[in-house]
C-alpha cells in the first residue's frame, strides 16, 4: 500500500483535474477525488477526467465519501470521513476488491477503524489547513508520536 495520498482541492488557479494531473505527473500513485460540496454529476464529470489519468500513471483512484458512486464508477476505492458510512457497511456494499479507508483524529478512532476492517487510515490534521471545514484539533508531531506509541502497544 502506498503511503502518500494526494487529496484533490482547488485554488484560484488550479482545479480538481489539473491538480490531480500535476500530482500524477510528479510521481504520485494515489489520488482521492474530494469534492465535498459537489453534486454526484459534478463528481462524475471530474472522475471521467481524473480516473483515466490515474490508470495511465498506474495510480490508485479513490472517491471521498460516496460509496455508491465509487461502485458505479469502478473506482479503486473510497475514503470515509468520521461522519460517513461505517467501514463495515461500505465493505458489504463494495466487497473485498475495493480499498476502503477512513479518517481518524484520535487513537480511539484508529481502534474503531481497525476493528471495522479499514484498509488504511488517514490520521490528522497534522497542522492547520484551510482546505477542510470544521477542522479537528491539530495533532502536530507530539500528537502523532503519542498515537503511534499507542498503536504499537495495541499491535495495530
Can you name each region flagged by the protein language model?
Residues 127-129:
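A short, flexible beta-alpha/helix-coil linker loop
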Residues 1-85, 92-119, 136-139, 146-154:
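Conserved N-terminal beta1-alpha1 strand-loop-helix module at the mouth
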Residues 131-133:
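Glycine/threonine-rich flexible loop motifs
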Amino acid at each position: 500500500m502506498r503511503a502518500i495520498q494526494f487529496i484533490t482541492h482547488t485554488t484560484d488557479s488550479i482545479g480538481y483535474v489539473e491538480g490531480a494531473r500535476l500530482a500524477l505527473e510528479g510521481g504520485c500513485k494515489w489520488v482521492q477525488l474530494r469534492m465535498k460540496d459537489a453534486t454526484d454529476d459534478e463528481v462524475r464529470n471530474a472522475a471521467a477526467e481524473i480516473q483515466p489519468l490515474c490508470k495511465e500513471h498506474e495510480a490508485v483512484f479513490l472517491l471521498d465519501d460516496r460509496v455508491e458512486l465509487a461502485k458505479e464508477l469502478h473506482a479503486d476505492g473510497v475514503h470515509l470521513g468520521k461522519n460517513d458510512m461505517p467501514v463495515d457497511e461500505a465493505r458489504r456494499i463494495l466487497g473485498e476488491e475495493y480499498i476502503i479507508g477512513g479518517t481518524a483524529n484520535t487513537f480511539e478512532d484508529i481502534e474503531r477503524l481497525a476493528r471495522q476492517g479499514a484498509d488504511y487510515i488517514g490520521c490528522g490534521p497534522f497542522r492547520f489547513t484551510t482546505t477542510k471545514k470544521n477542522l479537528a484539533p491539530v495533532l502536530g508531531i507530539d500528537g502523532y508520536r503519542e498515537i503511534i506509541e499507542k498503536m504499537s502497544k495495541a499491535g495495530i
